């Protein structure tokens, strides 16, 4: 199955090729967890790889556009100022040492192997939100403003993301999630949708009214809107600001990106 994309996304891919100085090779891959993923070149590689899953739908356009946004922001920074957020053994151990006692309360509910999987999933989920959501806010604003042909697909994707976020407010999710994970994840969801709600002029955070997340979330949303510097350096600063506010500073590290 060949990859067919709308013209706006084709334009973005060309911008990535021009900005990075390397071509993008599209490769069908059946076992992808999402419909598309761009793997930027390692030091000695000659081309970026755009993996896509057979049977994709129109949402692939937004997924690829979003990833192009991340790459362009990274490469717009001077080479010696490009950094990638990473999780490693050290950051994972910091998380486990902090959360071990809280995770232990689930020992009577699940078998040890399932708890191990859940502990990793909780960690990966929060770090993904923390390191992706702040730049995603700026990328989504930019895509909405600059690529109107993508707008309807973008909004459908964000509505789907919002529905998943709202589902995490349920009592069942609360019951089977460590307190800190539940709290910081919902605060980050609130901030993301609050800032975009204001930009898109939509009502996206009504389900959070009456929850405890609106208090810390409102303060962090205000900080995000007022203080965000719209570039890669600003992305790093805002991710660090979120991490500081949410007490997640040891759960990830920055690594210099080498081309």
Question: What kind of region is each of these model predictions?
Answer:
Residues 73-124:
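Post-HEXXH active-site segment of zinc metalloproteases
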Residues 59, 106-120, 181-195:
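Short, surface-exposed, charge-dense and proline/glycine-enriched linear segments
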Residues 63, 67-75:
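Catalytic glutamate of the conserved HExxH
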Residues 48-64:
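Short pre-active-site segment immediately N-terminal to the catalytic Zn-binding motif
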Residues 1-44, 56-57, 78, 125, ...:
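Auxiliary, metal-adjacent structural segments of Zn-dependent hydrolase domains
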Residues 6, 111-112, 136, 230-231:
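Helix N-terminus capping/helix-initiation residues
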Residues 126-139:
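Solvent-exposed aromatic/hydrophobic patches embedded in short alpha-helical segments
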Residues 138-259:
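Pan-zinc metallopeptidase signature
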